[in-house]
């Protein structure tokens, strides 16, 4: 019962920043609890980044973000080795993906080589630079956004990368009532500042372990 109440409390906090879109928020939280990654396909400006930030605050997750463009390099994601003159050694400089919740914004604007830099982290929970593998912090969640197919400057994500995402969601345009509420919140100072922490990283891991213990019958598994 405790885990269920914590999940409801997390959603309550995220709703302070995101107006409406309850079904999307519930599914996104389910994906996080199921140790999955999320792909958001939508037009710009509908609240995808706000949602990711709100979840990171409510779950007390270290947040990282990269705005993907054609000139973003794989090393920007995974990190790189830099020569230190004072020690005479190569030292690892962590990339943006070394965090708990990584927002890959407009992922399909990046080159295929840069897109693939996320694959190892998403599938194996580690990055490899210069032959040395380093684990990403746990828990680890990727929320990637992509513009709709055919949008200017985009390219299709490969199937190998799409397979790393548990859910593919779309927020869509806000309704007139939701737009009015957004204006009210902006006028009176609501939004991200009102989001409070519900659990820490250890608490999230306990929630995930509770999900792992849920019994699934053979009939459901073979569906």
Per-segment meaning from a language model:
Residues 1-24, 213-215:
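Dynamic helix-loop-helix/coil hinge segments at AAA+ ATPase domain boundaries and subdomain interfaces
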Residues 17, 44, 107:
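The conserved Walker
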Residues 27-30, 83-104:
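Conserved alpha-helical scaffold flanking the Walker A/P-loop in AAA+ ATPase domains
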Residues 29-35, 43, 94-97, 134-136:
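Phosphate-binding P-loop
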Residues 32-69:
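Walker A/P-loop
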Residues 43, 77, 145:
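P-loop (Walker A) phosphate-binding loop of NTP-binding proteins
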Residues 84-89, 110, 114, 122-214:
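Canonical AAA+ ATPase core
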